[in-house]
Amino acid sequence: MITKHTPDKTAALIVAVFSSFLAPFMGSSVNVALPIIGKEFAMDAILLSWITTAYLLAASALLVPFGRLADIHGRKKIFTIGIWIFSIGAVLTAFADSSTQLILCRIFQGIGSAMIFSTGLAILTSVFPPHERGKVLGINIGSVYLGLLLGPFFGGLLTEHLGWRSLFVATLPLSIVVILLLLSKEMKGDWAEAKGERFDITGSVIYVTAIVALMSGFSELPETRGALLLLAGIIGIALFLILESRISSPVLS
């Protein structure tokens, strides 16, 4: 038996699927273009790796804090801001004229990605009843793997014929569709399950700093600096967990 979807459900599914496709597609396609980007900006291997690392650092470190902000202020609101940041970041990256600008733009994109991924699945679980969630979550996960699969092929194709900058412009049509749906009447509701609760700024800062230290430490091993960063990250996570256990409105519950 096929369950008839309301416009709200259909719009939410399209928004989640398209946005879940975007980041993996861009990430895997950019990896193909790294040698050409490195040659254009005369970047060594370490600096070149930061095109990917900077994005992943921002996306990973901010995932939990943005998830909490979405619970307090509304998942749709945070998601919408995220897709705007991701899209603007893509345009800025396409016009970057130095390695520094390129890496900063990727950090900006990572911030948007964190806002998208911290809310996308949560929006689906808010819109769809329990008996439908397995199917829609499966579709959503499928879009992630589709992005990873198609990224290298189309990334190579676009880079060869239109240049590496086209990779970032190519995602804009999907982003525009997502933004239009978010602004439409089909996407009713904001889904703020912790509305009115306090956001733990101190805990968030400690968490973000610890995650950045951990990821940076792993990337710099076996250097002494890498080991020190790892140690700082572990201490930071321990401090974060102790702090969160003692407050009434934790970032991670």
Task: Please give the residue ranges for each predicted region.
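Intrinsic disorder in cytosolic terminal tails and internal cytosolic loops
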Residues: 1-8, 191
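Hydrophobic transmembrane-helix bundles of small-molecule transporters
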Residues: 161-253
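Residue-level signature of the transmembrane alpha-helical core
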Residues: 17, 21, 53, 84-87, ...
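Hydrophobic/small/kink-forming positions within alpha-helical transmembrane segments
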Residues: 21, 57-61, 91, 95, ...
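Short helix-kink/termination motifs in transmembrane helices of multi-pass secondary transporters
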Residues: 22-33, 58-61, 75, 167, ...
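Primarily residues marking transmembrane-helix entry/exit sites
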Residues: 6-17, 99, 200-205, 209
